[in-house]
Amino acid sequence: SVDWNKYRFTLDDGCNEAVIKAFVELHRKNKIYRGYRLVNWDPSLKTAVSDLEVVRQEKDGLLWHIKYPIEDSEDHVIVATTRPETMFGDMAVAVNPNDDRYKNLIGKNIVLPFVGRKIPILADDYVDMEFGTGCLKITPGHDFNDYEIGKKYSLHEVNGQVETSDSASDFKPINIFNEDAWSNKNVPEPFSNLDRFKVRKAVLEKLKELNLLEKEEKHHISVPRGERSNI
């Protein structure tokens, strides 16, 4: 049986030395590198938090259906989202390649409302044809699943146009919030320098004014919160 009176701390001399040796050896073999990745950020504590410190709260919420205009066309696609305030960071709209509703749109561009950024319509098997409208907005800077899709296509913006690339180093997510979860300079007026929930309210009001909000419907959501701050 296990003797619980005996234990080792990962920063003990022996353990620490072994970890450093392993990392150095892996680095020499080009098996390990230091890079960027999306993290859980607590705007109250102003620190990244472990996945183990994130708790999910189930609640009733809303799903908003938003019209995204197609470039050089009178048509649009409708994107369903629970977080319309993040649309300023959108870098693509993805559809399932087997979805007959959108096959003719793959490769075309969306002109993102309020921003004017041109974002591509991509085909990806990740998209669930049965959820929402079957059109998924891709916001790599603010969603873990979107981050993986953005990395897969190396999405990056060049002069107001989001492009894809075969080079992983080209991938550059667009971050729209600062450490306090207020909108930053990547968000245009009158939506910048606002708390994220005030951004949501302002976005929805403007979408209604421009007749870009198709509808809203009740939707059960799972909200991640920091275990220590409940934010």
Describe these PLM feature segments:
Residues 2-3, 7-180, 186:
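NTP-handling and nucleic-acid-processing catalytic cores
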Residues 42-43, 224-227:
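Cys/His/Pro-rich metal-binding microdomains
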Residues 104-107, 184-200:
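A glycine-biased structural micro-motif
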